[in-house]
Amino acid sequence: MARAVDDVVDHYGLPGIAVGVVVDGEVRQLELRGEAAAGGGEPITGDTLFKVASNTKAMTAALLARQVDAGLLAWDDPVAKHLPDFRMYEDWVTREIQVRDLLIHNSGLGPGAGDLMLWPEPNSFTREDVIAGLAHLKPLWSFRSRYAYDNNLYIVAGEVAAAAGGAPFDVLLRREVFEPLGMDGCRVGEWRVADAASVAAPHARRDGQWVARPDGEVVADMPMSAAGGVRCGLGDMLRWVQQWLDPGTAPGWLSEAQREAVWTAHMPMPMSQRMRDWNNSHFYAYGYGWRLTDVDGTAKVSHTGTLSGMYSAVTLLPELDAGFVILLHSNAGQARTVLEQTLAKLFTAPDEGRTVAHYVDALAREREQALEAGTAGLPADAQAPRAPADAASMEQMLGTWRDPWFGEVTVCPADGGVRFESARSPRLAGPVLAAAGRLLVDFDTLGPDADAWLDFSPAGNGLPARLTMAKVDPEADFSYDYEDLGFVRTGDCTPR
């Protein structure tokens, strides 16, 4: 395990990592590398807080399961029973959607629908805005017909828990999950950085170097707390793993019936060729906050977490009484994939001798094959030369535009060109460029992954002028859900 961690750190040049393993109920090994903030001199420890991101979802599900045990709600309760003002786009879905549906990604919405109200940070969207926005997000598929990952319904789940429990979500999570399990260092809601033993800063690459982006003095209570807002150190995450592998470590915390419900396959998930090739997997499904599959004939319960500059993985192998946690504070998706796979194979197929180098090469071959097949890489128009857009040629597009859930944006002359600016998400601002006969936005403070096409439809046939957006890179993070936006022109540009 130590060699695998070292190999991943060396190959990907990581600024730091925290990894721990539990076997037979005991913490057997800790591997800590690097600094909480690159160049800061403070080493990563078992108490250093990392954003666990979507590994929060299993904690939210556990909170709800505790409330089911307490008789405060039932999994098949209509959401509207607890949140009377809750609305989805279709009335029949509003009536039928149950508490369980909030946790299993079966809403019919597209992947990451509404995530632009959560990221990039900071922005001015509130938890109430996010929930109200669901009434305006048009589904891509029928309710309960297929899997598509979402975050916003976990935010709704947090509010259901708050309504049933009579206290804010963060208070309940601390009381019902952190305190009884001894996860005393974990943080959710608003908290002071000075009150934590150590806090890992997210890192991004700048000119070939890792640059830390530390928190301010106070970490605010963010709308996405129930979907991905928890921070924990490695020690506390290993306590989380221990109680799932051995309920005897937390007697009475959760009934056997609810433990079974959480780890039941509620929603089939599409299984990739990689899962078949690497792991000989036969199924893939979502439980309540957990992903369920098999690796080399062994059951695996796991989840990952991804936020800008923070990646995590929690993997449980219950039949082997083993599990491990990976915490990263850099944009290191491939590093997480490679290390998680390598460590899992140490348990499920130790005789195969799979190494970090093996999976690094496998990912490279996979990418090369996808590029050759034309299923990966930027399309031709995204690679075309770019030039500043001309305001005169965009006259009909200039003005103020409004989307019913995202709010107002402006497309207006500025600095000798044209700028796109969001009123509520200030980092979604940048110059408008022309490329391949189309227009796009190159956001000032975001990477090329965030670039977005702007497509204009003039007024006609009784319909107003409309502005829509789309990802320039089809492989970009689905949380840039531009495709869910539909702007209508509401006014002229204000002279600067």
Where are these regions (language model features)?
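Short, glycine/proline-biased beta-turn/loop segments that scaffold the active-site neighborhood
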Residues: 74-90, 181
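Peripheral terminal and inter-domain segments
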Residues: 298, 341-496
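Contiguous hydrophobic, core-forming segments of folded domains
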Residues: 322-353
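Short, small/polar residue-rich loop motifs at catalytic or cofactor-binding pockets
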Residues: 13-16, 308-311, 405
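Short, well-ordered beta-strand elements
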Residues: 313-316, 320-329, 466-469
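Short, surface-exposed loop or secondary-structure junction motifs
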Residues: 33-37, 91-308, 313
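Active-site SXXK
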Residues: 2-5, 19, 25, 49-79, ...
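Short, conserved catalytic-motif segment at the N-terminal edge
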Residues: 1-50, 72-74, 88-89, 132-137
